[in-house]
Amino acid sequence: MDKLIIGGVEIKNRLFVGSGKYPSNEIIKDVLEGSGSQVITLALRRVDLDNKEEDILQNIPKDVILLPNTSGATNAEEAIRIARIARAMGCGNWIKIEVISDSKYLLPDNEETIKATKVLADEGFIVLPYMCPDLYAGRRLIEAGAAAVMPLGAPIGSNRGLKTKELIQIMIDELDIPIIVDAGIGKPSQAMEAMEIGAAACLVNTAIASSEDPINMARAFKMAVEGGRLAYEAKMGRESKFGNASSPLTGFLD
């Protein structure tokens, strides 16, 4: 069974969760417990060290890896600045690069993301860039020092599932780096599908946070991700356009 290691850390639970859109910060601790997640993303604007009641960090256990994102950055320079601020605030060396200048579809800018990845990786950050799935961009991100890449399944927050499945599959097949499917996953079955094709992990936020019961939805996603990974490792049987009986069709009445 393959291990998922990012930045020298073994990640045993392949479901990453986000911290936005919940009805309150207090529920996040229960979601983390239900999901079993070891990694949580957060936007810096939700970290308030001067107000413990509003500070999201008060609800995240110390053993959970913080993955601050550069939400709000529209170019590489802004992403780099946000990442440095996150580290200075004590959020650690992990960073999820988000560079988005498109306000309608919220698609990441791969070129600016590559630039930011290079600078931050050289500064010792564990860089996980959010990207539009593309084999060539993935290769360049690896060359720039990315620890993993995070291609979108569908536009962020859309809950539309794996609309980019074939492109993600190509990246999984061709790139020797963890591929973490991020954005667009709306159902546990869609997370399972991503894991079945060989994704190293899934990041889910909106589908959990916007459900009527986020804690149980987190549990459902945990089981889906585990099941999908197990199916991938078990090497599923090939598809066929013809029927193939599972029981003998001859000999019994001869």
UniProtKB/Swiss-Prot annotation:
Species lineage: Bacteria, Bacillati, Bacillota, Clostridia, Eubacteriales
Binding site for 1-deoxy-D-xylulose 5-phosphate: 157, 183-184, 205-206
Protein family (similarity comment): Belongs to the ThiG family.
Gene Ontology CC entries for this record: cytoplasm
Keyword Transferase: yes
Gene3D superfamilies for this protein: Aldolase class I
Enzyme class name: transferase
Molecular function via GO: thiazole synthase activity
Domain of life: Bacteria
Protein name: Thiazole synthase
Quaternary structure and partners: Homotetramer. Forms heterodimers with either ThiH or ThiS.
GO BP terms in the entry: thiamine diphosphate biosynthetic process
Biochemical pathway: Cofactor biosynthesis; thiamine diphosphate biosynthesis
Keywords: Cytoplasm, Schiff base, Thiamine biosynthesis, Transferase
